[in-house]
Amino acid sequence: MSNKPTTPNLVDPKILFPAAKAAFVKLDPRQLVRNPVIFVTEAMAALVTLFFVLDVATGGGSRLFSGQIAAWLWFTVLFATFAEAVAEGRGKAQADFLRHTKSELSARKLVAPEGRETKEIPATMLKVGDLVLVQAGELIPGDGEVVEGVASVNESAITGESAPVIREAGGDRSAVTGGTEVLSDWVKVRITTAPGSTFVDRMIALIEGAQRQKTPNEIALSILLSGLTLIFLIAVVTLWGLASYSATVLSVTVLSALLVTLIPTTIGGLLSAIGIAGMDRLVRFNVIATSGRAVEAAGDVDTLLLDKTGTITFGNRMASDFLPVPGVTVEELADAALLASLADETPEGRSIVALATGEFGRGASQTGIDAVVPFTAETRLSGVDHRGRRLRKGAVDSVLRFAGLSDSKIPQEFRQAVDKVARTGGTPLAVADGNRLLGVVHLKDVVKPGIKERFSELRAMGIRTVMVTGDNPITAAAIASEAGVDDFLAEATPEDKLAYIRKEQNGGRLIAMCGDGTNDAPALAQADVGVAMQTGTQAAREAANMVDLDSSPTKLIEIVEIGKQLLMTRGSLTTFSIANDVAKYFAIIPALFVTTYPALGVLNIMGLASPQSAILSAVIFNALIIVALIPLALKGVRYRPVGAAALLRGNLLVYGLGGLVLPFAGIKLIDLAVSNLNLV
């Protein structure tokens, strides 16, 4: 399955219509009180509405003006709740699909642990420790561990990956997930999770946001926004007193409009949507985070611990070079190795064919092959008899034995080539034509293409990369140098991983790592961001705070980028929101006092038509900017792999300066429309 997320259509009626309905439900003050900025906005909208109703009843006041202010204040609140509802709605479809996979499941519970007699019960009645029997064509009724048997399992309902996986008792492939289907054979499963707390249940709750808790950064930002709101509330009350002293009459409608336009309603209205959208982006990468805290931690990560096999390298030994002995050309060696590998279906054999035909441009036909010699554990070599030639390749000692060469007859250059390959972490394969030694094929665990560039990007972001491997230090150093990692941990045991993580954390660093085995569980639990593979054990998945449904270790890099994008988006829109207040200040303050203090007219740098037009234009802009920024909040600020200082400069220029300039233009255009339409 692709790691790239699909970008949802933000104008999809299936998302917008339910979100519009949910936006009205979220107007409940008991829900809005969790967002102080929007709660104050709703309170002001209700207050202005009350005075508008009184004006209509008594026939006094500026009813058209106060009615429009009331309407746009309500729109401000609605647009904020709509942004959150749209963000939540994008995960509803996947949650509904997951809920469908677990509905009406039944289980065949074993009557006796050692027997095969079963009784059928609803899956919801299963308890932790129960043993169930699942055969081909049946759905696994709950999360558990395979204790007996081996089976092919279709996990597409959970991972989206159509290729079946093997689940068997013991080892790191024993964990199974409720709602997945057994395709062949049978397994005996011990239930490890109570109904309602299964992996699918947790996914549904996380996707829908039902259990979403505010992250530490969100709490800190909410406190900042609440503080700003309180400061502006005190300022507006003080302004009312000053206006009374100067005989300037300021209505409740005007003061309410002033307060709402000055408090940071833009980021206040989009804050929840940004957090939900960050987790949703992970879901679209097929990664489930247990909390928003984990996503934020990914954005602050300083060090990545990456397993060598599968993450940095392919994990299969592949041919990388031909090293002929004196008197043999590289073409002759390549031809012999190619012929000896034509019938070899192992990854190593196919890689020799690919190297000879690709990089060396050799070609060979299977015609003329008299016999094929397959690889066996006893002989440790393979090859062909071709037109009277006996071509063999394999382990060095096996090929030397086949060739019948004594130590004195082995070329020194051959020994040096074998030693060179071994020292650099590779595997030497000898090639012989009868009793004639031709040379060595260098097999090595090939570094994935493009991985070095990815590590360079991470380094530019200030993130250290550490390769973890069980290889000896010489081999580890060679691969680390080729891959471009900053450090490596050789001959690593689970205890070594845990000790390394603790050492880094004691130095004030945040650590991210991935793993799939039970032996990885302590390190996954200790890491600030622990990503477990869906194909891993139950212990690993429970210890981690993220689960990768594609089981792709390389995805840890994308997870870090998504975390950074979340933090950047929140910071950028906060900067934009606060910068907006400057333009609104120049729009409203002169309008309030220009009749009493004509000298304040010089502050009307936008040349707004009238005091009422200026106030109404600022309120309208304040509401519309929330709608305009919803796509950015959901999609996220564009991420570039550069250093923190460069990112800060760029975002301050775009969102700080943009937050200053855009409201001037926007309020002026709205003022022209308001005055031309005679709305005040």
Curated annotation (Swiss-Prot):
SUPFAM superfamilies: Calcium ATPase, transduction domain A, Calcium ATPase, transmembrane domain M, HAD-like. The active site is at D307 (4-aspartylphosphate intermediate). Gene3D superfamilies: Calcium-transporting ATPase, cytoplasmic domain N (3.40.1110.10), Calcium-transporting ATPase, cytoplasmic transduction domain A (2.70.150.10), HAD superfamily/HAD-like (3.40.50.1000). GO terms for cellular component: plasma membrane. It is a multi-pass membrane protein. It catalyses: K(+)(out) + ATP + H2O = K(+)(in) + ADP + phosphate + H(+). Disulfide bonds: none annotated. Belongs to the cation transport ATPase (P-type) (TC 3.A.3) family. Type IA subfamily. This is Potassium-transporting ATPase ATP-binding subunit. It comes from Rhizobium meliloti (strain 1021) (Ensifer meliloti).
